[in-house]
Amino acid sequence: MSRAIAVVIAVVLASPVAAQQGVNPIHPVFAPLDAAGKKVRTAQEMNPEKTCGACHDAAYIAAHTDHKAPRSAATCIQCHVSGARLDVRPERLDAEGKLRRDAIRIGTPRAANCATCHGLVLDVGAPVVLPDSFEAAPAVGRTWSLTRGEGAIIAPQRMVDSFLDLEGKESLAAPWDVHAAKLVDCVACHYARNSPARTDGKQGSLRYLTADPRRQTQAEFLVRPDHRLAEQDCRGCHDPLKAHAFLPYRERHMEVLSCTVCHASGPMGPAAEMVDATSVTAAGGPSVTYRNVDRRDGDTLNTATIRPLRPLLIERVESDGVRRVAPVNLVSRYRWVSRTDGADVPFEIVARAWLEGGAHAPEVVNALDADRNGRIDGAELRLDTPQKAEFIAARLRALGVEDPAVVGNLDAHPLAHGISTRDRALRDCNACHSEDSRLSDEYVVASYLPGGSPPRPPDGARVALAGTIAPSAAGGLVLQRDREAAPGILHVLGHSRQAWTNRIGFLVFLAVLLGVTVHGGLRYAMRRKRSHVAHPAAEKEYVFGRYERLWHWTMALSGIALIVTGLEVHGTGKWALMSLSTSVAIHNAFAVILIVNGFLALFYHLATAAIRNFIPHPRGFLASALEHMTYQARGIFYGESHPRNAAGQKLNPLQQVTYLALLNVLFPLQIVTGALIWAVGKWPAVASAVAGLHYVAPIHNLGAWLFLTFFVLHVYLVSTGRTPTDHLKSMITGYQHVDADEPEPEGAAR
């Protein structure tokens, strides 16, 4: 059985990769040249730059390329020739020493060319399997940056049909890469910037130009193609505002989030956490720790369980120059360098320091084999102590390396490839808008520290790591982030916490709640002592008209709905009464109802002059206020009659002051801040003007606490009538009990 599986895998690995260049009928025939410009008859003798430079401006291309040494060493042949190899043999040459037409398979780079360095690319005829070279000694220029860095595998096949052991594999009917399935090649996004076929860019520094119609001719472009490749993002082809009707506040989401936050949320390829080229495995490759691979002893990557990658969300400047939250995978890369000139020690020399005869040298085994089983594997490969690092450094010095040292870099690989179908896109709002948000994940930076040195953070201004890199319990490093630091200054509903407004609001609420509890308890105790005392005679008077009651109950129900949905938005994931999007929709609807009701009530009170009930009169105000305060502090406990209001007033001085603050300060404050929160989600310009929700949301939050406090106090004071339900009934029926010796309120409704 195992032999059969091996045969199948061998056939797969031998299958052709994604479609490559065919015979080019247009490209002129040419003579292969060596570095001196002389004709040669074999591929080994040929110099690509000299050969191609006979027609193309090789100097210009070398000065305008993203693939220059030492970062990469891509040649013309690797990128433009089928199979990354030009078939130069004597029998392929004509009498003039020129390559025959049928051997010229030169053209636009295809995905297979990119795969020779960057990652795993397979065509429709080859189920996905990881080749042996994936963990072998690194070839020159081969970085596996797509697969190791992003967990991306560029293939049109369904993931369920692969040979890999994927978690939840039976449900993975989507292709590995939807663009590969739709025959979209790498150059669709990464094209030459000065290509005349592209009209979506501009040259020069004129800021007011969105496109420059002045283009090179095709002939000029073929001589001087710019090899600084474009980084086209999703918005270059897709209009996200037309494809996310279900998403609330689409404009705000698209302004601050990269498309890949939801559409590349769980790549299924093996993504590296750490590439340690200071140590060498028995297979001759660097020691690699994977972030999403559960690997047992003896497992290969084809038999180990691969989980969906949970990326780190950070702020990153995208190709359009806008800083957005984007998913990245942090990879710590360690290597040996020479302190003398700062140059990297070639991995071949590092391998010689570790290996002898295709296996670990006996001296290395003797020094690093902690369990004395005769081999080095697992944690034994780690140079995580000064003694281990010095042992290998001494062997490197013996091989001629001057002053070797361990250096680490932290690379942030943006997840921009391996995009799957929309059914695998993240649709759970709680993934970000909750206490356990992906925005504040603790992220492992390094499992251990080779040579004891931490990796250097990413260079450049494109990536912003928010948080603190701190030691982990396992001896490595983790990126720790709190709710306010991740990422940047974004305020995320349901996740971000307004510490100072919560503290102030809760303390005020707690003080009022404690006060009414104590006050109510004393009232109850004193009422029991005088339970034999009858209530004084009273008459029913029609005090509250129909519209006043309708206005009051509409306001009350709207306020309750706003408090409940506000708590749901603020504490998403804790209450689980409804989804975040539903809570936001209901909250906004009741906010509109409350505002409309408030303006209609204002018109009513102005038109009927009932507004006078809310305006305190200076004459006798302090005396009346003191009388009502004395009653609440003492008289209510002994059954004394409620103090009379001033003639023509429905509200006592304490109520007038409270409603004056409520209707003229707190109510407008909540309307303005709530409207700004809504506007920030609709219009990006508003977000920029008010710094997002960073300041507006805490103020709105404090207002909500004060509204909740007023609600508790208001409900309690309802119970302070002749009976606990007397005031409540009056707001339902309109009739209120008035002591017989108490004159009828002049403002009573008829």
Where are these regions (language model features)?
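Positively charged n-region of N-terminal signal peptides that target proteins for export
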Residues: 1-4
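Bacterial N-terminal signal peptides
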Residues: 6-16
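A generic structural micro-environment signature
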Residues: 7, 52, 374, 382, ...
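Generic low-polarity alpha-helical segments
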Residues: 14, 20, 74-79, 114-117, ...
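Intrinsic-disorder/low-complexity coil detector
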Residues: 15, 24-27, 31, 683, ...
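C-type cytochrome heme-c attachment and multiheme electron-transfer modules
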Residues: 20-533, 624-658, 748-750
